Amino acid sequence: MRILGILLAQALVLSAAQADVKGNWKRHVVWEGLHNNVAVAADFTGDGKVDIISNAGNKTRLFVAPDWKEVIIGDHMDHNFIHGETFDVDGDGDADFIGARYQPGLIVWFEQPNKNAAAGPWKARIAEDEIIGIHGVLKADVNGDGKLDLLANSAQPKGKFPDSAVWLEVPKNPRLAKRWTRHVFAKNDAPGLSHYLGAGDLNGDGRLDITLAAKGGPSDKSGKGEWFAWWEAGKDPTRPFRKHLLPGKHPGATNILPADVNGDGKLDIIASRGHGTGLIWYENPSWKIHDINTELLSSHCLQVGDIDGDGDIDAATCAYISRKAAWFENDGKGRFTTHIIHDDQAAYDIRLVDMDGDGDLDTLIAGQRSKNVVWFENPLRNP
């Protein structure tokens, strides 16, 4: 009854915001049928069109644009992924896929076939299988060598790397390597069931720092969650980073991404409470908290980018309990207006991608409770 009351109150607040929507975001259904936690997009087939890879029911599927032909590229009982990434792992010029399972921890990379991505199964290889509680993965060049690495958390308080987080360095020959090279940047100092990661140079020293959030709540036996934090990189990125806890107690904290919100040249932080309520941003360097939205329940995914093409950073989410897809318009100074994209879509994962090649950022959503994969077409540059 309490959740129902919250949802009804929220509906009244968000209906007012809905009147300010700039155009109608056309909904494109790619696939329906099962619970989806992850969807990524890239031109996997090399034809200039953006394709999609998602995972549901232990099957990893490639959907080929523009008609979204379904190709099973992986079918394995162990491949129930909660998050994923895509980049060229093996350096052969095409995009590969990375899937992460929560528990027991497992990260698998799928090698795209060189000749025909849509021909059938892709070769799957293990990148990591010793960290436990992998809720988020993120590509980033951590050591500054010009090659992408992979960030991942080890959220569970057990195993070899309890309450920790790592970055994985791709081996010189990932096709032959038994596992990727693991570096622990958060060593036993990320308790409370951490979720998703972010990366950026927060202190302006030229090194890549890492952000992380922990939800806390009833399932957190340590009682040490409900925080947002960043880890400062040292001269040697293979050594543990220095943790900086950000202000406030944040029940349900999940997502945290560096971005210059107010245009002052410093990276601020945008964050959401995906197992709680609301979105905020922290102003660098004081880390003063500013509200983005105080009403939205369960904004369990977050992306940042210039959605309306006005030169500043906006944000987007899709809430899995309140089933609201929304974007947040920045006025350039850190004051945000909520716009509802759709009022019956649930997600754990959202991506900002130009799906149709028209030069603006659309939203790709892996429908968790809504059991679908959809993308919403950005109308802001339509005639």
Model-derived features with residue positions:
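Bacterial N-terminal signal peptides
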Residues: 5-15
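Beta-propeller-forming repeat regions
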Residues: 16-383
